[in-house]
Amino acid sequence: MRLTDIEIEQALDNGTIVIEPRPGIEAISGVSVDVRLGGQFRVFKDHTAPYIDLSGPSVEMQAALDRVMSEIIEIPDGEAFFLHPGELALAVTYESVTLPADIVGWLDGRSSLARLGLMVHVTAHRIDPGWQGKIVLEFYNSGKLPLALRPRMTIGALNFERLNHAVARPYNTRKSAKYKDQQEAVASRISQD
């Protein structure tokens, strides 16, 4: 069952769910809690790579990813990152989130932003039980105009579901967890599959 605003507040109060910095009461409504945009981004660099072989040898795949992804781009508070039509960028939430082994989270973009063409979380919107860290956002501008994204703007909302039982392998205890404890806009680690 999805947690209500009352249950979310209780989970934050008793430490079952941890969101740092803790959101104010105005950020919690209905069945969700707002999250804000952090100041770190990554983009695809200009490159001549004809493709990335997603099922090729890990070493070659990682080399291709290293060639095409930028380093972290830091955007100070008050300044903007511009996402142009047809561009993909990685970003990170301002908040860090910790979930117990019996709660799964879901991240949804804001409808008001989607109506301007901004996809906030292209496909991976599940936050696994046992997650700890910031959430990487996969932005895509499907609109017609560049969009100015500023650190700390409200970018999406998290909602939570309590599971019938705790999972046997919470995310942060799995050796295969590629994005464990992430604190920045981490690029794809598909080569580690």
UniProtKB/Swiss-Prot annotation:
UniProt GO molecular function: dCTP deaminase activity; nucleotide binding
The record's section on CDD domains has: trimeric_dUTPase (cd07557)
Keyword DNA-binding included in the entry's annotation: no
Instruction: Work out whether the entry's keyword set contains Nucleotide-binding.
Output: yes
Q: Which UniProt keywords apply?
A: Hydrolase, Nucleotide metabolism, Nucleotide-binding
- The enzyme's E.C. designation: 3.5.4.13
Where along this sequence does the record place binding of dCTP? 110-115, 128, 136-138, 171, 178, 182
Region described as Disordered: 174-193
Q: What class of enzyme is it?
A: hydrolase
Active-site positions on this chain:
138 (proton donor/acceptor)
Q: How does it assemble?
A: Homotrimer.
Q: What is the documented function of this protein?
A: Catalyzes the deamination of dCTP to dUTP.
Q: Which PANTHER family match?
A: DCTP DEAMINASE
Q: What is this protein called?
A: dCTP deaminase
